Amino acid sequence: MQGRLSAWLVKHGLVHRSLGFDYQGIETLQIKPEDWHSIAVILYVYGYNYLRSQCAYDVAPGGLLASVYHLTRIEYGVDQPEEVCIKVFASRRNPRIPSVFWVWKSADFQERESYDMLGISYDNHPRLKRILMPESWIGWPLRKDYIAPNFYEIQDAH
């Protein structure tokens, strides 16, 4: 079943794949990494003015990495805002996705966390560096193929 946003994107010739609806009835779409930035700008202009959350996950060991965006269309006088979930999948070997920091500023720390935990590089992000792990940390802790080190060096905070 095609949702309202998917139908609008098809009408305007924008490439995507409908993934159906989640348990709350929120439409979920898949966008290719190379199309994501332009579609993000279009969605912002269309009215999706709030990035509620961005997260990422490892689909399967040795498989793709996914960056997930929950967007909300907030309008004055509308009691029930319209929501959509966008999934952008990236190759594990070279996980690169365009940053949407310049569209939704709230993507700043969220994209940095996804980079820090899974190694997804968000192109054109102004401060893409580790946010939770030390800069010297090797590897991406939330990847399913990550092997935890046997020894952690505790650094003196003083």
From Swiss-Prot:
One of its GO terms (cellular component) is chloroplast thylakoid membrane. It is an enzyme of class 7 (translocase). The keyword Ribosomal protein does not apply. The keyword Coiled coil does not apply. Gene3D superfamilies: NADH:ubiquinone oxidoreductase, 30kDa subunit (3.30.460.80). GO terms for molecular function: NADH dehydrogenase (ubiquinone) activity; quinone binding. It holds the Pfam family Complex1_30kDa. It is found in: Plastid, Chloroplast thylakoid membrane. NDH shuttles electrons from NAD(P)H:plastoquinone, via FMN and iron-sulfur (Fe-S) centers, to quinones in the photosynthetic chain and possibly in a chloroplast respiratory chain. The immediate electron acceptor for the enzyme in this species is believed to be plastoquinone. Couples the redox reaction to proton translocation, and thus conserves the redox energy in a proton gradient. NDH is composed of at least 16 different subunits, 5 of which are encoded in the nucleus. This is NAD(P)H-quinone oxidoreductase subunit J, chloroplastic. The gene is ndhJ.
